[in-house]
Amino acid sequence: QFAAKPGAGPRHAKFSADGRHLHVVNELDNTITTLAYDAATGGLTLLGIVNTLPADFTGANTTAEIRVHPSGGFVYASNRGHDSIAVFAREEASGRLQHLQTIASGGRTPRNFALSPDGRWLVCGHQDTPLLTVFEVDAATGRLTRTPHSAEVPVCICVAFFD
């Protein structure tokens, strides 16, 4: 059991591929909390908290989605308000996150996104723009590059890949 700091607003959580770390996106204070998970006891220990927004951003924002890259080396979070995706390197041994990039999502209010099973693509759906945007993921660095590919959709609640 772990109690988030008051006002954080935990929204979603994803385990690392090895199951040793839990990354929680906090909707209200725009942070990601990283916890160590002890499978034997079920215990969670705080390892660190990182902000998903640039330091100079002063507008309204809530974070929405969090995903761990299939390689385990990167974590992604969407910012509704800043209209961006924050990219973090994930240190495998400690689980700690280091900010790498913040990139425009290509629409308003990025609600949900998914990584392809092979980790090559990230597709982002938006709450206030009827659009799916596609990013290529650099396998070595985790950084995103917006592609010219997109699709108009009337409403986007969830993005998922199926085998």
Located regions from the model:
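Surface-exposed loop/turn positions within WD40 beta-propeller blades
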Residues: 29, 72, 81-84, 129
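Beta-propeller fold detector
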Residues: 1-2, 44-52, 96-104, 144-152
